[in-house]
Amino acid sequence: MEEISARLSAVQDKILDIYEADKNDLTSQIEHWKLIRMECAIMYTARQMGISHLCHQVVPSLVASKTKAFQVIELQMALETLNASPYKTDEWTLQQTSLEVWLSEPQKCFKKKGITVTVQYDNDKANTMDYTNWSEIYIIEETTCTLVAGEVDYVGLYYIHGNEKTYFKYFKEDAKKYSKTQLWEVHVGSRVIVCPTSIPSDQISTTETADPKTTEATNNESTQGTKRRRLDLPDSRDNTQYSTKYTDCAVDSRPRGGGLHSTTNCTYKGRNVCSSKVSPIVHLKGDPNSLKCLRYRLKPFKDLYCNMSSTWHWTSDDKGDKVGIVTVTYTTETQRQLFLNTVKIPPTVQISTGVMSL
């Protein structure tokens, strides 16, 4: 028991060292996942020995440990393949090589430079969905890695690899759930892709393509409040250019302006919000001195959150004991979950999650 606890502590200390170093090279990311793989193996062995708690941590079930171990092994092998490619000297962060990004669409590919694509259903500005396309998609095969660009048309999000067009998101799937007319328009940067013939989505061909066209997709992080809006997993959103191919549908050159969102009577997952931007947040509550130390320790994890406040407290608190609060904001809920899964918060600090209008 003591020996296996010591091994787990040693591995987790090395993992924490990698987080604090916050390096952006591929070698460090491979080392990170090797350590995670060792951690999974220790947890699996501990559960086999009938141990339910190890180093004050709950030991996952055998099935959960085995499933995560398989995912980690697959990701590590993909990183090894990437390390043998011309892209090994590029910048690679913890977030870009995270399991969450690896398993997001398109699955089992590395992805960089997320771009927000907004689909407006039924010509209703309050009925929109946000999706994430990627300027750089790294297709991992047995011993090779190929870089392709994520593209968009009226049908959905796709990439072209080896003369094969692969869709990883069809807009008609969500249109069946959220659209009454089964019609929509796609907003990318300052341009809008519409279907001029107004044909139903179930009659749209997903194979016929016209001549390629190019559009400049500017980064428009539009997380404006809507009656229903979802972010699929955006990464850092960069200004970029990428080619866009279309089916029978055309590109409307009218500017998006501010008409795509509404700032009144908005909701965010059932909460009434009247703001142009809603962000996931975490409140860290505890002793002000402890929070000050925690803020310093969290600086190396700046890729895992958007902004962090100074320590503050409620002035209306009559209890006399001024509980400090640090507010951390995130671009997406996925980034927040990655933060909570990665960063070790002391047990004396209370964690509260929610959303905030910014």
Swiss-Prot record:
Pfam families cross-referenced by the UniProt entry: PPV_E2_C, PPV_E2_N
Position of the Glycyl lysine isopeptide (Lys-Gly) (interchain with G-Cter in SUMO) cross-link: K285
Quaternary data: Binds DNA as homodimer. Interacts with protein E1; this interaction greatly increases E1 DNA-binding activity. Interacts with protein L1; this interaction enhances E2-dependent replication and transcription activation. Interacts with protein L2; this interaction inhibits E2 transcriptional activity but not DNA replication function E2. Interacts with protein E7; this interaction inhibits E7 oncogenic activity. Interacts with host TAF1; this interaction modulates E2-dependent transcriptional regulation. Interacts with host BRD4; this interaction mediates E2 transcriptional activation function.
Gene: E2
Post-translational modification: Phosphorylated.
Lineage, broadest ranks: Viruses, Monodnaviria, Shotokuvirae, Cossaviricota, Papovaviricetes
Record keywords, A-Z: Activator, DNA replication, DNA-binding, Early protein, Host nucleus, Isopeptide bond, Phosphoprotein, Repressor, Transcription, Transcription regulation, Ubl conjugation
Family: Belongs to the papillomaviridae E2 protein family.
Compartmental location: Host nucleus
Region of interest called Transactivation domain, as start-end residue ranges on this chain: 1-200
InterPro entries reported for this sequence: E2/EBNA1_C_sf, Nucleotide-bd_a/b_plait_sf, Papillomavirus_E2_C, PPV_E2_N, Reg_prot_E2, Regulatory_protein_E2_N, Regulatory_protein_E2_N_1, Regulatory_protein_E2_N_2
A GO term for molecular function: DNA-binding transcription factor activity
Residue segments, region DNA-binding domain: 278-358
Protein name: Regulatory protein E2
Function: Plays a role in the initiation of viral DNA replication. A dimer of E2 interacts with a dimer of E1 in order to improve specificity of E1 DNA binding activity. Once the complex recognizes and binds DNA at specific sites, the E2 dimer is removed from DNA. E2 also regulates viral transcription through binding to the E2RE response element (5'-ACCNNNNNNGGT-3') present in multiple copies in the regulatory regions of the viral genome. Activates or represses transcription depending on E2RE's position with regards to proximal promoter elements including the TATA-box.
One BP term from GO: DNA replication
Species of origin: Human papillomavirus 58
Record field: compositional bias (Polar residues): 215-225
Signal sequence residues: none
